[in-house]
């Protein structure tokens, strides 16, 4: 169904988008560290909540994109465009339902999640969350629009918008934080502005009728329960999976915070590098959902199997290249980061162990899941990922830390166990062909 050129045009921009966004995010984080310890703590606390909420919007966008892809694959373009409208309606409604309580009840919400924190930190967090919450509808709409363009095989546009948005965010930080001295409010305003502009651009471009998916009129959108239900059947399990994954990371983070500054600094560096090393492969996974979704919609099940295998292999190669490169230059990376000698030594040791294992087991533990979700096998993916995450990563990590008094290596032993078990489960599910038996549209 796809030529090599079509796959290149789809996948390369997706890979660049993920890598560039990760790089820009790191730069953004470094800039925010200049506004004081109370402000840094506030941003860190609120961002952990922000990531959880943004994952909900990303899951909704995934659900809508899979429905649209399957309709396009079955040559039902009108229904695909109708599904896009319902996706926009759904994310707008859900984002407003989330935004309003986050603004009105932000103090009790932050107290409930993070307990008692210093007054200065809480005041900064309240200001930051108020402005950040205003951006939720815009990031939700952008995610929906970006997913639809990728489904239409136009992944260059979301890449360009994401890159421009990140540049705008950094320039906004310079202006609001350093020129106007607005502190955390400046950081939040910069994020809000960049998200508003990104959403407006993508909504305007979605009105072009030349593309596979477009919206003729936003004012004419009315809810259709049947289509919204189809989107939610994929979006809700995916959202639970993403949410549990993020929540598990927070539990692990709180465990690491008891290990001392040397271990915390080393763990933070390795975690950042580990996340960066797989961004390009995640881009391939996002492309896989479009490709496999269309194949399943066209009832080309052998093609769906073929592309799941071939794109997983490609992602494996890309992951190995990124991991090997980071392992090769890890000493220089820790030096550029200005890490203290003990933290750098621990980070280098951990990186070599973790990345050697990651090159083998990370890809089969994640990439087949994109193909399964595209076929509608979202409940299996949710259950497998959630159980594996909590049993291996969380329980094993806490057990090793509290029983054997292990340092950050405990986190990566748990993660390695998660990758290994999930790899075998996903591969067994893929071989069984049960993932192709779901009816999505």
Language model segments and positions:
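Transmembrane helical elements of multi-pass membrane transporters/channels
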Residues: 9-28, 131, 165, 194-198, ...
């Amino acid at each position: 169904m796809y030529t090599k050129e079509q796959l290149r045009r789809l996948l390369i921009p997706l890979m660049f988008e993920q890598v560039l966004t990760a790089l820009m995010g790191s730069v953004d984080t470094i800039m925010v560290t200049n506004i004081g310890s109370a402000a840094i703590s506030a941003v860190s606390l609120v961002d952990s909540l922000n990531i959880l909420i943004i994952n909900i919007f990303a899951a909704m966008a995934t659900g809508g994109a899979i429905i649209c892809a399957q309709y396009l694959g079955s040559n039902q373009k009108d229904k695909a465009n109708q599904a896009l409208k319902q996706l926009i309606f759904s994310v707008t409604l859900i984002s407003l339902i989330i935004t309003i309580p986050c603004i009105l009840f932000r103090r009790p919400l932050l107290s409930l999640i993070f307990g008692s924190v210093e007054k200065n930190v809480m005041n900064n967090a309240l200001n930051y969350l108020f402005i950040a919450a205003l951006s939720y509808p815009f990031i939700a709409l952008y995610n929906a629009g970006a997913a639809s363009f990728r489904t239409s095989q136009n992944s260059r546009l979301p890449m360009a918008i994401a890159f421009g948005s990140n540049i705008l965010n950094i320039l906004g930080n310079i202006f609001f934080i350093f020129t106007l001295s607005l502190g955390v409010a400046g950081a939040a305003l910069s994020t809000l502005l960049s998200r508003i502009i990104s959403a407006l651009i993508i909504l305007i471009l979605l009105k072009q009728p030349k593309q596979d998916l477009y919206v003729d009129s936003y004012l004419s959108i009315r809810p259709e329960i049947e289509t919204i239900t189809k989107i939610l059947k994929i979006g809700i399990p995916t959202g639970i999976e993403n949410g549990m994954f993020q929540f598990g990371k927070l539990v692990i983070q709180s465990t690491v915070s008891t290990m001392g500054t040397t271990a915390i600094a080393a763990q933070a560096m390795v975690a950042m590098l580990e996340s960066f090393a797989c961004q390009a492969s995640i881009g391939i996974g996002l492309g896989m959902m479009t490709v496999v979704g269309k194949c399943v919609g066209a009832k080309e099940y052998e093609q769906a199997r073929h592309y799941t295998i071939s794109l997983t292999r490609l992602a494996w190669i890309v992951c190995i290249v990124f991991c090997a490169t980071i392992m090769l230059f890890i000493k220089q990376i820790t030096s550029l980061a200005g890490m203290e000698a003990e933290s750098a030594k621990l980070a280098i040791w951990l990186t070599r162990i973790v990345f050697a294992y990651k090159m083998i087991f990370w890809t089969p533990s994640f990439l087949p899941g994109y193909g399964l979700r595209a076929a509608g096998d979202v409940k299996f993916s949710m259950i497998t990922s959630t159980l594996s995450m909590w049993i291996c990563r969380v329980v094993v990590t806490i057990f090793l830390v509290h029983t054997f008094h292990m340092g950050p290596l405990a986190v990566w032993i748990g993660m390695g166990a998660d990758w290994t078990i999930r790899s075998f489960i996903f591969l067994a599910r893929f071989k069984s062909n049960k993932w192709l038996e779901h009816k999505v549209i």
